[in-house]
Amino acid sequence: MAAWPSPWLPLVLVAALLAFEDWLSTPSCSGGSPAPDLAAGDLRAMMVADLMLLGSDATYADRFFRDHVTSKLFTKSIETTNPDMIIVLGDISARGSEHNESKWIAVLEQFEGILGQYSSLPLHIVLGDKDVGGCSSLDGKLVHHMAKHLPGLDSSGCGAFEFSNISFMSLNAVALLCGGNTLRFNVEKVLERESHHFQKKGLNGADHSPLGSENGEGVGAHSWRQNSMTLGSGPVLLLHIPLHKSQKSDTGVIGVPMFPDGTVSDHPLVPPSSKLRGVDGRRLYDQSHTLPANSTQYILQALKPRIIFSAHADSFSDHTHPDGTREVTVPAMTWKKGGMPGFAIATFGQKGVVSVNCCWLVQEWYIMTGYSVFLFLTALAIRWSHWI
């Protein structure tokens, strides 16, 4: 029987593998990794998005390779950043709108398995468009069946909670993209109720009437009542779809962001018959990837958020709206969308200061190449043992 050329070689290979796995799973964060110890009273949240898990539909490659690697990435990221809670900003499922209730539960169990020993951390999950579907398939019953398995969400897919004296609010932003449906009206009612709640908690202490349309026409009516809340005195707002980002054109008119000519939306929220080119195509692209301008204005006016966290754009951005409200868009934490996966770490200080670090993970081809090289070296070492 062939022997190893050196008794130390297997140990060297194992040590090299462990060092490689530790390197690939360590996130690279802007400004360096957040300090492991927080000041008294501070809160740190790990913001992830667009995991796009398949649950019971996962392939063997997903179950025995991607889930294993993703679990290592989560474990190392949590050990490095030491968050107090985890927030998923939508699209935890790749095709949740096609799932029945048992398949939806399988997705949640898959995520729990990926978190492993850290599945006991406080967790809040926001619903995204891949979870509930586009406007043509948005169904209140489906949203209710999903939301009842997600602590903190009501039947419309919205939620409000407090953690470490910090108020959070999550909205079913997908419903706000779709006019004329009951789910949208329910989300608007949640907005009015929470706005009333935060006004009552405000420094003025006056009992204000709920915000919203005087005639019940909803967000689009633009007839909200005066809000006495100061900027940033509202909750930390959690969304999947980002807010509309206006910018000045050459004529000085506020309009939608412009994209290169020929941009065509292939987003599931947009029907294929509506895919256009040129200016109309660019507007359609923006409308399918951000909330409408009127909904954005209403949310900012009604809630006066402390800060907004959103996703869906697959990339990181830190944007300040014209009224001074800060919105941070979190990158996708999956290889399925291409590019480099990542997440954000938000640290909430007691004096109202929020610091955000964007952390990036390795691309999938690094992992595939690394494991391939390790297998090649192992095979070469075994082959070498036969030659000696």
Describe each PLM feature range:
Residues A2-I105, Q110:
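N-terminal active-site segment of His-dependent metallophosphoesterases
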Residues A49, M85-I92, N165-A173, K275-G278:
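Surface-exposed beta-strand-to-loop junctions
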Residues D42-D57, N165-G179, P235-K245, I307, ...:
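Active-site-proximal beta-strand elements of phosphoester/diester hydrolases
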Residues V48, L89, V126-L127, L238, ...:
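Generic enzyme active-site microenvironment
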Residues L53-G55, A94-G96, L127-S136, L176-G179, ...:
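Active-site environment of divalent metal-dependent phosphoester hydrolases
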Residues F20-L24, G41-R44, N82-M85, Y118-L123, ...:
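Loop/turn elements at helix/coil->beta-strand transitions in domains of secreted/extracellular proteins
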Residues P27-D37, S97-G234, D250, I254-V264, ...:
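Extended active-site neighborhood of metal-dependent phosphoesterases/phosphodiesterases
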Residues W4-G32, G157, D250, M258-S288, ...:
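Binuclear metal-dependent phosphoesterase catalytic core
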